[in-house]
Curated annotation (Swiss-Prot):
GO cellular component, one term: plasma membrane
Chief location of this protein within or outside the cell: membrane
Signal sequence extent: 1-20
Keyword Isomerase found: yes
UniProt keyword rRNA processing present: no
Catalytic function, reaction form: [protein]-peptidylproline (omega=180) = [protein]-peptidylproline (omega=0)
Protein name: Probable FKBP-type peptidyl-prolyl cis-trans isomerase FkpA
Gene giving rise to this polypeptide: fkpA
E.C. numbers: 5.2.1.8
Gene3D superfamilies on file: 3.10.50.40, Peptidyl-prolyl cis-trans isomerase, FKBP-type, N-terminal domain
Length: 272
């Protein structure tokens, strides 16, 4: 049994390492996002005894780790996997020593990490090229302006209040999209306007929000070097991704009679 637990730990480590490769941190799932795997809500007693329910729970736990590996491109042979598990469980002779099993798993992990790194590099190159092409075409559209840093923006509603500085706290409403239109974050999904220090978000936001007056609205087109660069962010923002944000500057400072609320997602936080 000791061998099973050690191999399971290595398997889980492989899944987590592959998932983390090239990513800063994963955004917590919003209320609108579906669970990774669907589940039938019902009486667990239908599975059987407490022992059988626990067995099912352990299978689900291991299955999730293996599914995570598969999603990162590291598939295993389930037939061989279950054969080995059954042999150990039944006390039969197994085809590997504990040392050999650890050596094989470490080699497997290294190979998968190398594949993940190569994929990350390829994705970064492709995303950068797509982003540059998008921004080149977008720059010629009516109302779109480009700053010296490369940030593009379009004012959709002029505000009438004050303009913030980079040292201010601001309250905003926003929606973030990839250039293919995929929405990856929004204040609406997070429960309403969010409040944060303007100096603690990605450079494209720090610069862009300063162009607005209170009540003003704009669309920001943020090149990757002003966003998350080659590292990307979470599961939705790939390496060198160009981002599009619709933003409304509700006010400078926190809402009256309400504490400052940090963004529920990571998608506009500053990259260290």
């Amino acid at each position: 049994m000791n061998t099973i637990f050690k191999i399971s730990a290595l398997t889980l480590s492989a899944a987590l390492a592959l998932s983390a490769c090239g990513k800063k941190e994963a955004a917590p799932a919003s209320a609108s996002e579906p669970a990774a795997a669907s589940s039938a809500q019902g009486d667990t007693s239908s599975i059987g005894s407490t022992m059988q329910q626990a067995s099912y729970a352990m299978g689900v736990d291991i299955g999730r780790s293996l599914k995570q590996m598969k999603e990162q491109g590291a598939e295993i042979d389930l037939k061989v996997f279950t054969e080995a598990m059954q042999a150990v469980y039944d006390g039969k002779e197994i085809k590997m020593t504990e040392e050999q099993a650890q050596e094989v798993m470490m080699k497997f992990l290294q190979e998968q990490q190398a594949k993940a790194v190569e994929k990350h590099k390829a994705d970064a190159k492709a995303n950068k090229e797509k982003g540059e092409a998008f921004l080149k075409e977008n720059a010629a559209k009516d109302g779109v302006k480009t700053t010296a840093s490369g940030l593009q923006y379009k004012i959709t509603k002029q505000g009438e209040g004050k303009q913030p500085t980079k040292d201010d706290i601001v309250t905003v409403e926003y929606e973030g999209r990839l250039i293919d239109g995929t929405v990856f974050d929004s204040s609406k999904a997070n429960g309403g306007p969010v409040t944060f220090p303007l100096s603690q978000v990605i450079p494209g936001w720090t610069e862009g929000v300063q162009l607005l007056k209170e009540g003003g609205e704009a669309t920001f087109y943020i090149p990757s070097n002003l966003a998350y660069r080659e590292q990307g962010a979470g599961d939705k923002i790939g390496p060198n991704a160009t981002l599009v944000f619709d933003v409304k500057l509700v006010k400078i400072g926190a809402p009256e009679n309400a504490p400052a609320k940090q963004p529920a997602q990571v998608d506009i936080k500053k990259v260290n």
